[in-house]
Design a protein with these regions (language model features):
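Conserved structural motif at the start of ABC-family nucleotide-binding domains
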Residues: 2-4, 17
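ABC-type ATPase nucleotide-binding domains, specifically the catalytic core motifs of the NBD
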Residues: 12, 30, 68, 93-113, ...
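The feature captures the beta-strand-to-loop junction immediately N-terminal to the Walker
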Residues: 33-35
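Helix-to-loop junction immediately C-terminal to a conserved catalytic motif
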Residues: 48
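Conserved ABC transporter NBD signature motif
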Residues: 56-64, 76, 110-115
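Conserved ABC ATPase signature
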Residues: 132-136
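ABC ATPase C-loop
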Residues: 149-150
Length: 235
């Protein structure tokens, strides 16, 4: 469904991604594991069209995403929830959510239906829909960020470090929601440092270091890999 082949990315003279290849099939939940600065966000920003790949191919089904505008990529069904949430803190929860539907702004009925689905997934947001997003807790702000991405009607959802800055219980709840989104039919590509939480819900995973994919496998093989356990699970 989403396939990267030999993707490279440069920031000036610095090589951020070097020959990255990965695949997320229909209905899969695929994790991209890596330490801070390993290249996870660079992968997502390149898929989303924010950064221009220096080489390689990025395909969604039979379409090439290379050269598409970010809004076109969203309209085609590949939607990112960025690291750090990137909300507008002074705007209401509802307005933040509706920004995610911008590329579908001419389809009011479908947007209202989608909003109902998001509120059903995150009932607390319905209660706080008129509150400034910046007044919410970190976990609630992450709900807004995920909900905003869902308003874009993703077929492939890119989640960049959703556990960042959250308490352990909130991380558990967040990952349960991510699993529910996937089980409802959305393909998920999840970038995380929290290997223990991420691998528990993953079908497959890749490990990225210094802009290169250095390992891949199913959940069980990576959970039991000694190097992965030492580096990311602390065991």
């Amino acid at each position: 469904m989403l396939t990267l082949e030999n993707v490279s990315l440069n920031y000036g003279s610095f090589t951020a991604l070097n020959g990255v290849s990965l695949h997320a099939g229909q209905g899969e939940l695929v994790v991209l594991l890596g330490a801070n600065g390993a290249g996870k966000s660079s992968v997502f920003l390149t898929i989303s069209g924010i950064h221009k790949a220096a080489g390689g191919s990025i395909r969604y089904g039979d379409k090439s995403l290379v050269g598409m505008k970010p809004s076109q990529i969203v309209a085609n069904g590949v939607v990112q929830c960025p690291e750090g949430r990137k909300l507008f803190p002074g705007m209401s929860v509802l307005k933040n959510l509706m920004l995610g539907a911008y590329v579908h702004r001419g389809d009011g009925a479908a947007n209202r239906q989608r909003l109902e689905e998001v509120m059903a997934l995150f009932p607390i947001l319905d209660q706080k829909k008129d509150d400034p997003a910046g007044s919410l807790s970190g976990g609630q702000q992450q709900m807004v960020a995920i909900g905003r991405a869902l308003m874009g009607r993703p077929k492939v959802l890119l989640l960049d470090e959703p556990s960042l800055g959250l308490a352990p219980l909130v991380i558990k709840q967040t990952f349960e929601v991510i699993q529910r989104i996937n089980q409802a039919g959305t393909t998920v590509l999840l970038a995380e440092q929290n290997a223990f939480a991420a691998l528990k819900i993953a079908h497959r995973a890749y490990v990225i270091e210094s802009g290169r994919i250095v390992m891949e496998g199913d959940r069980e093989s990576l959970m039991n890999n000694e190097a992965v356990r030492r580096a990311y699970i602390g065991a």
